[in-house]
Amino acid sequence: MEAVEIKNKWNWGYSVHIIQDGCGTVAVDFEDGYEWGYINGLVVHPSRQKQGIGTELMRKAEEVIKEEGYDEAQLLVEKEREWVYEWYQRLGYKMIMDKDGFYKMRKML
């Protein structure tokens, strides 16, 4: 598993992108002034789903957040993707906001 830090050109923070053997990826954004890491862009190739890769990527994303000195992870889930919402719940995430077709979720690390 490889983690690559990418500074953005707008200077609002930075992102760490985690790649798993070319079959999955996730990003963690760290924005100036926020006290959490924001997890987004979790993708696993369809042929490799249901093999624990998504869970492994999430664990690595949480590890990166802790290494950067934060103790909270947040993410958004589309309401229409109920199975994804339930999967994040199994990983320990709790809904903190229900707005505009999305659930905002948080996990204390």
Q: Where would I find each of the regions flagged by the language model?
A:
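Conserved active-site alpha-helix within GNAT-family acetyltransferase domains
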Residues: T55, E67, K79-M97
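Residues that form or flank phosphate/diphosphate-binding pockets in enzymes
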Residues: Y34, G52, W83
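Conserved beta-strand-loop-alpha-helix junction that forms the acyl-donor binding cleft
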Residues: L75-V84, G101-R106
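Conserved GNAT acetyl-CoA-binding A-motif
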Residues: M58, I65-V77
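Conserved acetyl-CoA-binding loop-helix of GNAT-fold acetyltransferases
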Residues: V44, K50-E63, R90
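Acyl-donor-binding surface of acyltransferase catalytic domains
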Residues: L109
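Acetyl-CoA-dependent GNAT
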Residues: M1-G41, H45, V64, D98-D100
